């Protein structure tokens, strides 16, 4: 095992430019961040109407590691991320519905919220000017910390449903942005979208079937501010 670890560290030292590693903080604009989980079905197989979960603040830290190959950068993050979805439908089995049930029943409103620690690892391709653009793509592991369910119509309190969801989810991520490289400091602004590659659960949760669903999130503006380690004034 020690030999494998030593070999891995040696390979990294051959491909990473240590002098330009930057670490910093990253946060999104909650007004232009949204997530959704769909499609969702009830126990009869009827599809719920789903709506995006907007206006959520996410933040965390990042490390940006230029590779010795020109234009390529390894970008890693550790973020708090909130995802969820709103849904509505008639949660009454078909056998219990009368011919005019839509006139006598209220449409039930629900909300699922999932909180993750998100750890993306992205490969970036960038220009070389002080103010430059970049593209990025990669994968992420999301670690579930808490999941809650709310039946909004009856003003019920949030219910902890964490045990019903998978603790670990793999996602794909793509995006792009611009970077301002100012001596010791770099500032980034980007947009990014991600989607689940593995299921968030494999069974019904409070009468909602997630078996065919896919989680999706979109952040139109996120800002990062980083500090270069080992920077030497030229």
Protein language model regions, located:
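Short glycine/proline- and aromatic-enriched beta-strand/turn motifs that initiate or cap beta-hairpins
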Residues: 19-66, 70, 228-234
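Residues that define the transmembrane beta-barrel architecture of outer-membrane proteins
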Residues: 21, 53-57, 113-117, 131, ...
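Transmembrane beta-strands of outer-membrane beta-barrel pores
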Residues: 27-33, 80-84, 139-145, 193-199, ...
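Outer-membrane beta-barrel translocator domains and adjoining extracellular loop/strand segments
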Residues: 35-44, 86-93, 147-156, 200-208
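Predominantly the C-terminal beta-signal and adjacent terminal strand-loop region
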Residues: 36-38, 164-234
